Amino acid sequence: HGSSAASDVYKRQIYDPVGGDFSEQAFRAIAWNGRFLVIGFASGPIAKMPLNLALLKGASLVGVFWGSWSAREPNESQNNFSELIKMVDDKKFIPLVTEIFKLEDHASAFACIEERRAKGKVILSMK
């Protein structure tokens, strides 16, 4: 059917940096043998998951905490960071920038983040 094993893995993964009410719905929608990656809780509340879903879906629920992982696996962390920078350089990964503030407006930029109004990256411009 033309897809590689690697692309099939990506189709069975859910990356959740938001948490909250939609986490359980997303986990209910996961494919058989899928992986649900818990990245963070940007929405505020920490989701409560019925663990029987992992059993019924044959799925894995994996916590991904960058700080601990990079401290425990520094070589792998550096390799991942280098790969990410290459993807940005090659325009294969383009971060979504939704807010740009002048440096002197830094308080407004931080307020945008703290009040959860930012939908993408918030940039402080020195120009």
Residue positions per predicted region:
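Short beta->alpha linker loops
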Residues: 17-18, 101-105
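N-terminal Rossmann-like NAD(P) cofactor-binding module of classical short-chain dehydrogenase/reductase
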Residues: 12-15
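Glycine-rich phosphate-binding loop and adjacent beta-alpha segment
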Residues: 21-93, 125-127
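Single conserved hydrophobic/aromatic residue that forms the stacking wall/gate
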Residues: 1-10
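A general lysine-centric signal
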Residues: 10, 57, 119-121
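A structural signal for short, well-ordered beta-strand elements
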Residues: 47, 99-102
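C-terminal capping/lid region of NAD(P)-dependent oxidoreductase domains
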Residues: 85, 90-99, 107-127
